[in-house]
């Protein structure tokens, strides 16, 4: 299944459930006692792309102001989650330089690539920009990271939650019941093929 088909399948599955209030809420977003942390290799979009995302988010804010909107500094594509977030993770327990060296090794000889955010999709708890990449470099980087970290004794939890195959960016997360389910779906569909830009 190609990326477009994956994104379409996610929304096709979620849409009827959203309209019948079968959504999920992230109850930890506002929890001051949430101490989970981990290590993730992130890919950040440029300023132009982020500004376009904010323009789209402003449409959602008009109808769903109580939801969680990612700040500019948190908008990203996950390259790969090296250590999945968990409550007792302590950065002082690892040598971060060793992780940096493995990542550098994984990136060595990889060609440049571009990412394009084109359109929105949604699951039961969030709205995402659909990300597309122009060659196989991102897949190669992810596979290199998996292979190179598995050769070490470093703490890691690669693909523990799921095997990452997309290049999406979550930009809105539900933290309360939707006030207007129909309008929410309409905004998603309005921007279903919107070109946020390439970087």
Residue spans of the language-model regions?
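Histidine-dependent nucleotide/RNA phosphoesterase domain, centered on the 2H-phosphoesterase fold
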Residues: 1-199
């Amino acid at each position: 299944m190609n990326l477009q088909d994956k994104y379409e399948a996610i929304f096709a599955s979620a849409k009827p459930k959203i309209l019948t209030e079968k959504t999920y809420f992230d109850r930890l977003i506002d929890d001051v006692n949430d101490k989970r942390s981990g290590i993730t290799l992130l890919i950040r979009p440029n300023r132009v792309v982020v500004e376009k995302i904010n323009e789209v988010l402003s449409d959602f804010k008009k109808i769903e102001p109580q939801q969680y909107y990612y700040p500019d500094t948190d908008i990203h594509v996950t390259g790969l989650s090296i250590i999945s977030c968990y409550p007792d993770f302590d950065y002082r327990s690892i040598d971060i330089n060793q992780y940096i060296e493995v990542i550098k090794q994984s990136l060595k000889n990889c060609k440049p690539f571009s990412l394009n955010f084109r359109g929105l999709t949604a699951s039961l708890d969030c709205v995402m920009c659909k990300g597309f990449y122009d060659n196989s470099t991102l897949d190669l980087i992810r596979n290199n990271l998996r292979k190179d970290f598995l050769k070490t004794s470093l703490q890691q939890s690669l693909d523990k939650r799921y095997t990452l195959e997309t290049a999406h960016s979550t930009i809105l997360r539900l933290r309360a019941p939707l006030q207007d389910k129909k309008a929410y779906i309409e905004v998603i569909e309005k921007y279903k093929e919107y070109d946020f830009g390439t970087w």
